[in-house]
Amino acid sequence: MMEFLFLDLDDTILDFHKAERIALSKTLTEFGVEPAEEVLALYHRINLWHWEQLEQGKLTREEVQVGRFAALLRELGVSADAVRCTRSYEKNLAVGHYFLPGAEEAVASLSQKYRLFLASNGTASVQAGRLTSANLYRFFETVFISQELGFNKPAKE
């Protein structure tokens, strides 16, 4: 009989894509950029490249976080501070806790039958904010966030 369940946070319990889109739109607007579809698509291409570089060990997490906004702002010809843009985005994302349909109820039900553990490869401060605002900590015995562990998931280490 199973006693433990490991669950992933993003796109299993919380809708990361919705949270990302809303946080990015708020951030871009704050910095005077219209969050048009082509701008969001450009960000996603830049963001994907940066995360791939992290997975290959070519960039650090901090370089990804700031570098993606530096590249986006450069591509758009916007003279704004990429560090401030990153902070704004992470602040906006940290409160983005949009449950996938039925996920909140499923986690509550599973927590009555199993010891639950959570894994996430997100940024620690952002994920902690999302978990707190969604009131999810109460369901999990332990939360594993890759940044806190020093490994990206899935890592063999």
What is the predicted function of each stretch?
Residues 84-87, 92-96, 103-134, 142-152:
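Substrate-recognition element of Asp-dependent hydrolases with the DxDx(T/V) motif
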Residues 2-9, 13-101:
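N-terminal helical cap/lid subdomain that shapes the substrate entry/recognition surface
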Residues 79, 137-141:
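Conserved H-loop
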Residues 25-29, 70, 74, 108-111, ...:
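Class I S-adenosyl-L-methionine
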Residues 154-157:
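Short loop-to-alpha-helix "cap/lid" segments that border enzyme active sites
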Residues 1-3, 114-115:
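Short coil/turn segments at beta-strand junctions that form active-site/ligand-binding loops
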